[in-house]
């Protein structure tokens, strides 16, 4: 059985090594100028680097396209027509609309389209990680063959029958989640301080916010840009998040306490009042992973980013627990800290009182409000280049701590047993 991987970036390389380890012959390719480097890096493992996707497509029984979502149509149009007769073809992008459209347009009619989505980043081995499998155009026999191949990696497979449903869920679990953390990063950059040096960001919830923000900015902008801009369901959900944040912020400024409190308690009852198995994040563990070197006492925080998320879920009629089938560590952590906040009435009341009446945090909330509007506008306009530039500016601001933050967040994820 020959496995082919078109696109040997971070994820492509991880899967090439994993399939080889599982006993398959692996062929791969990338851009021409990277061939020599990849031969040096992957050749010793026994992975054969071919000239281009045409050669990979002609020799492989199962082909994975591991390229940016914004380039999937271009790449499939070049190499899809050369797909081996009866081969299985999959994509590794996180948004399936452009991928399926390209496969249907350029692949031979006898090819099987069984696409997938790995719910982890390049910092994790596929073993034990969740993977979504979507049988779009296939037979029972080919689907069994594909699931056997993917299971050999040790991944935990979950099937979603329809790619539209996948993209709806991922709009919440990834696009809106990432945009929330990106807005925090932008707000801290514009305010000109590192949050771990500020007493308002020393609690367990804030440790998680900081580490996941650093984790996201330690990766590549195109990963998140494609998720947000190319997913047709993401814009609606991101727009609702921005509206929730703006409406809550206006109530805070006007100190309309009764309306503000009632709105959040209604959202709490809708999301957390049902009989779900709680995620139960551990405060002791969250406190361990602080980047702060000092011993200042924690100041109350409005947690506007979390209030806005829960309010947006409520207005969209989304139950985030239903979306755990497509969970990623940042989404599960975000839902976990929202649950931790909203199911602790004393902490929720502290957050509400701080949001309404504590002027010392209002400047930070204003920066967050501006950042949410900026990110929402960029995504709404479909401005991929603007997205990347905005992302890189924040990445530069945090450059000295990104690697450490990613390592810490990976350890936090492992310790909270949410891989």
Predicted regions and their residues:
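Rossmann-fold dinucleotide-binding core
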Residues: 96, 103-171
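C-terminal non-catalytic accessory extensions
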Residues: 264-419
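Short, well-ordered alpha-helix to beta-strand connector turns
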Residues: 23, 46, 60, 86, ...
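Rossmann-fold NAD(P) dinucleotide-binding segment
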Residues: 54-106
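Interdomain hinge/lid region at the active-site interface
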Residues: 197-294, 354-374
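NAD(P)+-binding Rossmann beta1-loop-alpha1 motif at the extreme N-terminus of oxidoreductases
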Residues: 1-48, 55
């Amino acid at each position: 059985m020959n496995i082919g991987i078109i696109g040997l970036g971070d994820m492509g390389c991880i899967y090439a090594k994993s399939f080889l380890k599982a006993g398959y012959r692996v062929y791969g390719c990338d851009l021409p100028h990277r061939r020599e480097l990849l031969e040096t890096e992957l050749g010793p493992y026994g992975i054969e680097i071919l000239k281009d996707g045409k050669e990979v497509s002609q020799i492989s029984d199962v082909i994975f396209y591991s390229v940016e979502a914004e380039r999937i149509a271009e790449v499939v149009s070049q190499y899809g027509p050369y797909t081996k007769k009866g081969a299985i073809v999959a994509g590794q992008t996180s948004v399936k609309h452009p991928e399926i459209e390209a496969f249907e347009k350029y692949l031979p009619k006898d090819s099987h389209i069984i696409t997938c989505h790995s719910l982890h980043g390049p910092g994790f081995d596929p073993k034990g990680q969740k993977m979504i499998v979507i049988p779009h155009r296939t037979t029972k026999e080919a689907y069994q063959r594909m699931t056997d191949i993917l299971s050999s990696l040790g991944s935990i497979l979950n099937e979603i029958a329809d790619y539209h449903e996948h993209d709806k869920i991922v709009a919440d679990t990834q696009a809106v989640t990432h945009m929330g953390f990106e807005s925090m990063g932008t707000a801290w950059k514009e305010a000109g301080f590192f949050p771990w040096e500020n007493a308002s960001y020393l609690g367990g919830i804030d440790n998680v916010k900081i580490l996941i923000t650093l984790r996201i900015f330690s990766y590549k902008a195109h990963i998140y840009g494609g998720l947000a801009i190319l997913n047709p369901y993401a814009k609606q959900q991101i727009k609702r998040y921005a509206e929730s944040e703006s409406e809550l912020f206006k109530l805070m400024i006007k100190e309309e306490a009764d309306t503000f409190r009632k709105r959040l308690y209604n959202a709490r009852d809708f999301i957390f009042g049902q009989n779900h198995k709680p995620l139960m994040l551990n405060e002791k563990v969250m406190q361990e992973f602080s980047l702060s070197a000092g011993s200042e006492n924690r100041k109350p925080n409005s947690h506007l980013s979390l209030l806005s998320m829960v309010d947006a879920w409520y207005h969209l009629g989304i139950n985030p627990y239903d979306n755990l089938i497509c969970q990623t560590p940042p989404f599960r952590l975000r839902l976990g800290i929202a649950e931790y906040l909203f199911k602790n009435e004393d902490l929720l009341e502290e957050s509400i009182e701080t949001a309404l009446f504590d002027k010392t945090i209002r400047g930070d909330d204003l920066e967050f409000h501006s950042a949410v509007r900026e990110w929402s506008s960029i995504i709404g306009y479909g401005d991929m280049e603007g997205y990347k530039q905005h992302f890189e500016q924040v990445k530069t601001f945090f450059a000295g701590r990104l690697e450490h933050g990613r390592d810490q967040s990976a350890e936090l994820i492992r310790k909270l047993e949410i891989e």
